[in-house]
């Protein structure tokens, strides 16, 4: 009560302050919390807050001097390190302040990879004039292609980065064609020229031969030491076109990304194409029709820095006040405009939704933590809409979720984020891929959960065809490993499509492979067989007929639903033997015999037995009492048989956890 009275006195002392200015008032953390959480607050119009020196400098820059660009490359070619040097060069951060400033997730710093495309605004003075540069650091791994594609929507050009010692790799090729198809201006950059093994001339030759790029404007740099990095920004200013937009038109704003903040709620990353947006405006979503009041707008500099306004051509963040009621309201690719301008504004085309192609089941280690796991998953999915989520239940592991991902690394990173950012203790099943069932009546179903796969009789009587997804894999590696790579691809049911040398010693090999083989540690085997020199990229190539079966684990003839997998028939013997051997290691002995089997339908493909505890029923007998001995042994045998028939096998939760661990 005392706190409320003090707040009332404080507010009455400044009756003319608009609520939005309280949000911006220095040191007003309590006021901020009050006005950003209450649903009764409604802003009455754009707020007027004094400009900071930074914002005054930005407001003086016309859209003709905006440059939006990204850095694209194969994984581990130095994108994040180069981003650091550019931020230092423009004075956005202090030299040596932090390594990989734009890699904000713990999992990114641990693995040394970029998972989420991150943005930053910079101001660069070129020939006496300020330029507003907007940089996007994109992921390099194929699993995060959707992040790269979305980043291109807010850019007018890209730095195509190539490692001077490794040359063009698989994802360099993929990222080039993706950027080229969207009409981005590409600037070749050769990185790591300070390495003893660097061959910049060879890398430039590869760029000319593979992409027909003019390498006269290529910049040779070392992001690690900063060598020649200062030559990049003049090239960006002169080569990359300014964004097209008009501040006088009605607001047209694209939602590029979103994430969750425990204090502010859902925060949206937006690209303003036309008009301007400021705190206090009421905007409406074209996708949902829901109206919101803008609570705050700002830029990433590199941290969230509030601004009075975001204008046409800028990329920044906004959050609403009151915030979005549900995280699903933040639809990536949605267009926003001011209320009343809906008919005057044409919504932007948005993004193609990526399809999840790798599925796992996730269960809490402790069933009491199910709600915490659900909240954690929903918060992470807000930041990554390519993940699909469905609730499911298992007799062995209880309530859980069926999660869909773009690839195995995508899945692994999500699992790490659940553990690190939310403290979740989870059990994850091995990854599997969907199967298409074509019924004889012409209907088609996509099966992502093995427990919904038709049984053996239905497959024989009602199913016309089973199909599995295939991908077109592009592999690049030194020619000395050609035999090893071809052997690996053939062993994984691959079909060779093309083979070409893009240099006298470097090979590009294309194979059509089942996606199921790719998620079964294909990349690890490829790296091992080529001593780490091979790189891999892939894209979907459709569905093909296949002999798919359901492999089950049986414990005393009862199926363990959490372990079932859909596999190609040729893999059943190998996988079945692995399953029963591994599961036996984690099952405790009991009073009766436990039979562990791997089965396809009614056919048993592998078996192991856990022997029971032995009780010596003959201990008190006289050695000569043969008939009594036989009678007691027969009685014990019958008792064990009866116990096995009616007794439930008690399998500890940790046994499943150990069995499903990689």
UniProtKB/Swiss-Prot annotation:
Transit peptide per record: 1-42
List localization entries.
Answer: Mitochondrion inner membrane
Query: What Enzyme Commission number(s) does the record list for this chain?
Result: 3.6.5.-
Q: What is its main location?
A: mitochondrion
Q: Which residues bind GTP?
A: 73-80, 137-141, 191-194
Recorded hits in Gene3D superfamilies, A to Z, give: 3.30.70.240, Elongation factor 4, C-terminal domain, Elongation Factor G (Translational Gtpase), domain 3, P-loop containing nucleotide triphosphate hydrolases, Translation factors
The tr-type G domain covers 64-244
Any one Gene Ontology biological process term? positive regulation of translation
Q: Which Pfam families match?
A: EFG_C (PF00679), GTP_EFTU (PF00009), LepA_C (PF06421)
Q: Which reaction does it catalyse?
A: GTP + H2O = GDP + phosphate + H(+)
Keywords (A to Z) from UniProt:
GTP-binding, Hydrolase, Membrane, Mitochondrion, Mitochondrion inner membrane, Nucleotide-binding, Protein biosynthesis, Transit peptide
Q: CDD domains, alphabetically?
A: EF4_II, LepA, lepA_C
Q: Which InterPro entries match?
A: EF-4, EFG_III/V, EFG_V-like, G_TR_CS, LepA_C_sf, LepA_CTD, LepA_IV, P-loop_NTPase
One annotated GO molecular function is: GTP binding
The EC category is: hydrolase
Membrane-topology descriptor: Peripheral membrane protein
Which PANTHER family does the record cross-reference, listed alphabetically?
Answer: TRANSLATION FACTOR GUF1, MITOCHONDRIAL (PTHR43512:SF7), TRANSLATION FACTOR GUF1-RELATED (PTHR43512)
Function (record text) = Promotes mitochondrial protein synthesis. May act as a fidelity factor of the translation reaction, by catalyzing a one-codon backward translocation of tRNAs on improperly translocated ribosomes. Binds to mitochondrial ribosomes in a GTP-dependent manner.
**Stored HAMAP family:** LepA
Name of the protein described by the UniProt record: Translation factor guf1, mitochondrial
């Amino acid at each position: 009560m005392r706190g409320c009275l003090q707040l009332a006195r404080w507010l009455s002392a400044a009756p003319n302050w608009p609520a939005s200015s309280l949000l911006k008032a220095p040191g007003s953390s309590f006021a901020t919390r009050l006005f950003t959480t209450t649903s009764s607050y409604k802003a009455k119009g754009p707020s007027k807050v004094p400009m900071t020196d930074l914002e005054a400098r930005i407001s003086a820059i016309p859209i003709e001097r905006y440059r939006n660009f990204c850095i694209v490359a194969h994984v581990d070619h130095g994108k994040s390190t180069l981003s650091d040097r550019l931020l230092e060069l423009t004075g956005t951060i202090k030299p040596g302040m932090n390594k990989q400033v734009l890699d904000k997730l713990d999992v990114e710093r641990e693995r040394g990879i970029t998972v989420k495309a991150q943005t930053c605004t910079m101001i660069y003075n070129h020939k006496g004039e300020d330029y507003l540069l907007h940089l996007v650091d994109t992921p390099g791994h194929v699993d995060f292609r959707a992040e790269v594609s979305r980043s291109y929507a807010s850019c007018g050009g890209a730095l195509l980065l190539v490692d001077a010692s490794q040359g063009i790799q698989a994802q360099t090729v993929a990222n080039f064609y993706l950027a080229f198809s969207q009409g981005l201006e590409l600037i070749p950059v050769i990185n790591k020229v300070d390495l003893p093994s660097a061959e910049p001339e060879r890398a430039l030759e590869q760029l000319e031969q593979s992409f027909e790029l003019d390498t006269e404007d290529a910049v040779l740099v070392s992001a690690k030491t900063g060598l020649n990095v200062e030559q990049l920004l003049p090239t960006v200013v002169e080569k990359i076109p300014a964004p097209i937009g008009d501040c006088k038109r009605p607001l047209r704003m694209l939602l590029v990304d979103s994430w969750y903040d425990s204090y502010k709620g859902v925060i949206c990353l937006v690209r303003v194409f036309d008009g301007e947006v400021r705190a206090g405006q009421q905007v409406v979503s074209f996708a949902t029709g829901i109206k919101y009041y803008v609570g705050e707008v700002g830029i990433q500099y590199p941290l969230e820095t509030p601004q009075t306004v975001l204008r046409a051509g800028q990329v920044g963040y906004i959050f609403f006040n009151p915030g979005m009621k549900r995280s699903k309201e933040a639809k990536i690719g949605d267009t926003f405009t001011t209320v009343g301008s809906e008919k005057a504004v044409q919504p932007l085309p948005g993004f193609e939704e990526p399809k999840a192609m790798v599925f796992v089941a996730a269960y809490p280690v402790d069933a009491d933590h199910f709600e915490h796991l659900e909240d954690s998953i929903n918060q992470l999915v807000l930041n990554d809409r390519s993940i699909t989520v469905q609730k499911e239940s298992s007799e062995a592991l209880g309530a859980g979720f069926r999660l869909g991902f773009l690839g195995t690394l995508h899945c692994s990173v999500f699992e790490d984020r659940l553990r690190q950012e939310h403290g979740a203790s989870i059990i994850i099943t091995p990854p599997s891929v969907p199967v298409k069932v074509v019924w004889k009546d012409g209907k088609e179903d996509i099966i992502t959960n093995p427990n919904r796969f038709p049984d053996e009789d239905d497959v024989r009587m009602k199913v016309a065809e089973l199909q599995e997804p295939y991908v077109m894999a592009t592999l690049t590696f030194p020619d000395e490993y050609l035999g090893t790579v071809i052997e690996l691809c053939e062993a994984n049911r691959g079909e060779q499509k093309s083979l070409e040398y893009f240099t006298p010693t470097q090979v590009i090999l294309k194979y059509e492979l089942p996606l199921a083989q790719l998620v079964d540690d294909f990349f690890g085997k490829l790296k091992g067989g080529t001593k780490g020199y091979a790189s891999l990229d892939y894209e979907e190539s459709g569905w093909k007929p296949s002999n798919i079966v359901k492999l089950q684990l049986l414990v005393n003839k009862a199926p363990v639903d959490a372990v079932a997998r859909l596999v190609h028939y040729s893999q059943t013997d190998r996988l079945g033997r692995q399953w029963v051997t591994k599961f036996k290691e984690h099952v405790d002995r009991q009073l009766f015999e436990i039979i562990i089997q791997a089965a396809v339908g009614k056919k048993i493909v592998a078996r192991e037995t856990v022997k029971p505890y032995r009780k010596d029923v003959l201990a008190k007998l006289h050695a000569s009492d043969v008939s009594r001995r036989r009678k007691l042994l027969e009685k014990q045998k019958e008792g064990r048989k009866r116990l096995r028939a009616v007794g439930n096998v008690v399998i500890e939760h940790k046994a499943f956890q150990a069995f499903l661990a990689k």
